């Protein structure tokens, strides 16, 4: 009996000494939830003062394009977001005068299909290619220059500056601009180049020269025959004169 009591006490002591160690072990860390998909319009809504730009992003379908690009590929995107005050600076009726296609081009002109950090502006190559398309002069050129900490942007129609960094995560960069970027293709289209004058082919010119020569040949032959006839008449007259003179003598 005494022996059993000793074993029981020993077991209780063993449990008391090992339990705190078990209880003190940290529970496994819970993995953080993956970040939600990047949504440009939500970022702009959170920043405020981009109501008109958000409305145009949605109405043109560009917002859905950006959502798909950011969440289904590794390609970065840079957006120059004009504030609401930028749109109030436009001439009255400017947006309403645009066709649906031109509105899409206008919004796409504010999107660069690559990530551009603030430090990259100093070394970036001009003209920048936007999602609006051809960056050649007269179409959708966009040029960026820096002067100290100031980033200047020109489209050939609009000159403005970057006034703030709205958002940046290594894949998406959003910068606020002071004016709406107006592309040349929409707001200052160049007249089409005149068609070159039709050139006369060498073969046709040679044929024309040949025809001209052929036309002159009969005239030259006729002139020669007339000259021969005149000479013959003169000779005949002389012969007749000599014969008459000899006859009377």
Swiss-Prot record:
InterPro entries: FAS1_dom_sf, FAS1_domain, FLA_A. It holds the Pfam family Fasciclin. Residues 1-24 form the signal peptide. It is found in: Cell membrane. It is a lipid-anchor; GPI-anchor. Residues 37-181 form the FAS1 domain. Keywords: Cell membrane, Glycoprotein, GPI-anchor, Lipoprotein, Membrane, Proteoglycan, Signal. A lipid is attached at residue 220 (GPI-anchor amidated aspartate). Residues 221-249 form a propeptide. Its main location: membrane. It comes from the Eukaryota. Residues 186-219 are annotated as: Disordered. GO terms for cellular component: plasma membrane; side of membrane. Disulfide bonds: none annotated. Glycans are attached at residues 39, 71, 143, 152, 159. GO terms for biological process: plant-type secondary cell wall biogenesis. Belongs to the fasciclin-like AGP family. May be a cell surface adhesion protein. This is Fasciclin-like arabinogalactan protein 12. It comes from Arabidopsis thaliana.
